[in-house]
Amino acid sequence: MANALKEKYVNEVQPALIEKFNFKSSMQAPKIDKIVLNMGVGDAVSNSKNLDEAVEELKLIAGQQPVITKAKKSIAGFRLREGMSIGTKVTLRGERMYDFLDKLINISLPRVRDFRGVSSKAFDGRGNYTLGIREQLIFPEIDFDKVNRVRGLDIVIVTTAQNDEEGRELLTQMGMPFAK
C-alpha cells in the first residue's frame, strides 16, 4: 500500500466509521468506489478541435485516457445530431483514484480563488458527492500558457455509503474541506 490516503482510510477512517455507525463488520464501512471526471464540451459541435484539447487536458488531469461521450438524442436548438461527440469523461478506480483524490484535496482545491470549502449539500441521497470545478487551471498538470480556453469539469465521487450522512462522514474524515 503505497498511497498515503489509502493507508489513512484503512488505519484511521474505517475504524472510526465502524465505531460511529456501529457496524458489525469492516465490510459494512463505506468506502470510495470510484471517481468520475466529466467535461462537457458543447462547443465541439461547431469546432471538433475543442474536443481534442479537452481530451488532452482531461488526460493530463486524470493520468489515463478519457473516453469521448456522444449525444443520445438530436436537439435542433443546439444544432446537435444524435451520435455527435459532445464531451469526454474518465473513470478512476484503485490506486489512481486515491492519487487523484489526494491531489484534489491537498493541491487543487486550495488553488481555487476565494476558496472557503466545498458545499456539504451536494450529496445525491445515496452517499455520492458531486463537485463542479469552474476552471481546469487549478490542477498543477495544466500549463497556464498552453490553455486557450477555460473549461470546467464535473467530479463525481461514488461511495458505497447507504445514505448522505455516512458519505459526508467518510469524505470529511478523508480530508475533504467542507464549508462550515
UniProtKB/Swiss-Prot annotation:
Keywords: Ribonucleoprotein, Ribosomal protein, RNA-binding, rRNA-binding, tRNA-binding
Keyword hit for Manganese: no
Gene Ontology MF terms: rRNA binding; structural constituent of ribosome; tRNA binding
Cited InterPro entries: Ribosomal_uL5, Ribosomal_uL5_bac-type, Ribosomal_uL5_C, Ribosomal_uL5_CS, Ribosomal_uL5_dom_sf, Ribosomal_uL5_N
Coiled coil: none
GO annotation (BP), single: translation
Manganese recorded as keyword: no
Stored PANTHER family: 60S RIBOSOMAL PROTEIN L11-RELATED
Protein name from the UniProt record: Large ribosomal subunit protein uL5
Species the sequence originates in: Leuconostoc mesenteroides subsp. mesenteroides (strain ATCC 8293 / DSM 20343 / BCRC 11652 / CCM 1803 / JCM 6124 / NCDO 523 / NBRC 100496 / NCIMB 8023 / NCTC 12954 / NRRL B-1118 / 37Y)
